[in-house]
């Protein structure tokens, strides 16, 4: 059996512009502290795999310290961690996914197409992709079908399900089932 935790849309370093300045600063501090509470949760519940589906940062160029804090928190986890950058924190020049040193247990998807990672000990195959720009009009799952090979296949993507406008990795419900 595999135990996994999924998360997304942390939006670290958000300005919280609708809040008064002091409250916004408190929320940013709380968001950063949450990372280490998450690490404690993962370790305390024997989680094997952490799947983070994008927009961990509110922009593609957050404060360096925030990227380093996230890397430190993920490094404390005794789980394997996979990250699929989203439309706010897309993978590209200057992004923390390139500028921060990430721990050995963290894999960041870097391509705007599905990449495959295998974990033979768990009979698991993970498919993930990264936004490499703020918009991704073509769906990452278009034309994909998981092979019937007896392995557990998990997809890790940041996107929208059945959107009216295709801007952020449009995903059709039928594609999820494939």
Language model: regions and residue ranges:
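N-terminal active-site segment of His-dependent metallophosphoesterases
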Residues: 1-68
């Amino acid at each position: 059996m595999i135990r996994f935790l999924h998360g997304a849309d942390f939006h670290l370093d958000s300005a919280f512009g609708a809040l008064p300045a002091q409250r916004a600063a408190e929320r940013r501090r709380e968001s950063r502290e949450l990372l280490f509470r998450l690490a404690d949760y993962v370790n305390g519940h024997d989680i094997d795999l952490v799947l983070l589906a994008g927009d961990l940062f509110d922009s593609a160029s957050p404060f360096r310290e925030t990227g380093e804090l996230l890397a430190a928190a993920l490094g404390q986890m005794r789980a394997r961690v996979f990250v699929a950058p989203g439309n706010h924190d897309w993978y590209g020049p200057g992004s923390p996914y390139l500028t921060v040193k990430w721990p050995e247990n963290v894999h960041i998807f870097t391509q705007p197409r599905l990449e495959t990672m295998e974990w033979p000990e768990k009979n698991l195959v993970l498919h993930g992709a990264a936004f490499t720009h703020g918009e991704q009009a073509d769906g990452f799952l278009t034309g994909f079908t998981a092979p019937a090979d007896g392995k557990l296949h998990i997809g890790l993507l940041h996107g929208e399900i059945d959107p009216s406008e295709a801007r952020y990795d449009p995903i059709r419900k039928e594609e999820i089932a494939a």
